[in-house]
């Protein structure tokens, strides 16, 4: 809700991102840690995309969505970390008004797309395990492209609408955001005008981007587990579980981190806790994803090996 009691209303040209620490001596350490994780995220996800695109054996629905998930993870991390690194390097906390809205839009869009792709990948595993005879028709290239397009539309439109609604909000002279990125809830706390519509939009996006994909994932894995336990052969069970083990690991890490923070009692809320949660699902998990999908997957390891061999041959 807006704060009608505030009368010091002004046209805001920029905001201040307070970052993760107020201590100057900690800034070089934070810069090194986040630069390292960002580079690992970008290189790891780029290698997955190159390995999948260069190996014809990986031109399947599962790896098609994995390549798009890797691209989404790279874009999601790039929406916030480079600006944080630039602010630390220049010893500045400023982000322009337009830059803040642009960052918010990309974070919402790619964050929502990440969730949507995780749900689609769970459905892909459900069809592969529970309906193997219909897999080629149920997950045809045309349908995969359609599902990807639907995910882009479903995440882009609400993110754009929320960002446009923020342009109608009047902000007060106070413009400090206690995060390393433009958090929508923190932005609304700086508003001087009514924000009921914006808050309703945040709730709607939470349901659309988090709750609906999670329900689809849970439904898919309930059906998968039921189908796997019917299999009498231990080898068959292991093969079925191995096809979705990496995806399930990523899902548990991502949603587990969110629930571990946001389902705690409101009395324990703090900006520090929310910042740590943001670091976990915006930086650490995208950094781990390439390792999870490559180290636990024989086909990916073989494709990466071929990619490195071809790279050495090219440079030699």
From Swiss-Prot:
Mark the transmembrane ranges: 29-49, 61-81, 101-121, 146-166, 200-220, 244-264, 275-295
> Could you tell me the superkingdom of the organism this chain comes from?
Eukaryota
Instruction: Give the subcellular location.
Output: Membrane
Q: Which residues form the signal peptide?
A: none
Ranges facing Extracellular side: 1-28, 82-100, 167-199, 265-274
**Any ranges marked Cytoplasmic in the topology annotation, and which?**
50-60, 122-145, 221-243, 296-316
For this protein, the record's InterPro entries field holds: GPCR_Rhodpsn (IPR000276), GPCR_Rhodpsn_7TM (IPR017452), Olfact_rcpt (IPR000725)
Q: Which residues, renumbered to this chain, are glycosylated? A: 8
The terms describing its cellular component in GO are: plasma membrane
| Keyword annotations from UniProtKB, A to Z | Disulfide bond, G-protein coupled receptor, Glycoprotein, Membrane, Olfaction, Receptor, Sensory transduction, Transducer, Transmembrane, Transmembrane helix
Tell me yes or no: is Transmembrane among this UniProt entry's keywords.
yes
The protein's topology relative to the membrane is: Multi-pass membrane protein
The molecular function GO annotations come to: G protein-coupled receptor activity; olfactory receptor activity
Q: What are the disulfide bonds?
A: 100-182
Q: Which GO terms describe its biological process?
A: signal transduction
Q: Which family does it belong to?
A: Belongs to the G-protein coupled receptor 1 family.
Recorded hits in PANTHER family, A to Z, give: OLFACTORY RECEPTOR
Function, in words: Odorant receptor.
**What name appears for this protein in its UniProt entry?**
Olfactory receptor 1N2
Tell me what organism the protein belongs to: Homo sapiens (Human)
């Amino acid at each position: 809700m807006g704060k009608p009691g505030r009368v010091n209303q002004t046209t805001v040209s920029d905001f201040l991102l307070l970052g993760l620490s107020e201590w100057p001596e900690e800034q070089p350490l934070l810069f090194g840690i986040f630069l390292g994780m960002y580079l690992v995220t970008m290189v790891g996800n780029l290698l997955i995309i190159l390995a999948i695109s260069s190996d014809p054996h990986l031109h399947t629905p599962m790896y098609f969505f994995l390549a798009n998930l890797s691209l989404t993870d790279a874009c999601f991390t790039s929406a916030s970390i480079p600006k944080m690194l630039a602010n630390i390097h220049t010893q500045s906390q400023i982000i322009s008004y337009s830059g803040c809205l642009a960052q918010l839009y990309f974070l919402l869009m790619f964050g929502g797309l990440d969730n949507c792709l995780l749900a689609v990948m769970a459905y892909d595993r459900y069809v592969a395990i529970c309906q193997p005879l219909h897999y080629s028709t149920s997950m045809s290239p045309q349908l995969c492209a359609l599902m990807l397009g639907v995910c882009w539309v479903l995440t882009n439109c609400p993110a754009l609408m929320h960002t446009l609604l923020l342009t109608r909000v009047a902000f007060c002279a106070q413009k400090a955001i206690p995060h390393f990125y433009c958090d929508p809830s923190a932005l609304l706390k700086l508003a001087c005008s009514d924000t009921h519509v914006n808050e309703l939009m945040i709730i709607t996006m939470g349901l659309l981007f988090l709750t609906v994909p999670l329900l689809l994932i849970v439904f898919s894995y309930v059906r998968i587990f039921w189908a796997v336990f019917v299999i009498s052969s231990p080898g068959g069970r292991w093969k079925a579980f191995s096809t979705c083990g990496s995806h399930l690991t990523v899902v548990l890490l991502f949603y587990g981190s969110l629930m571990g923070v946001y389902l705690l009692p409101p009395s324990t809320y703090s900006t520090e806790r929310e910042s740590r949660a943001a670091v976990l699902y915006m930086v650490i998990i995208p950094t781990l994803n390439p390792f999870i999908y490559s180290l636990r997957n024989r086909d990916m390891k073989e494709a990466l090996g071929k990619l490195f061999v071809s790279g050495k041959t090219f440079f030699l």
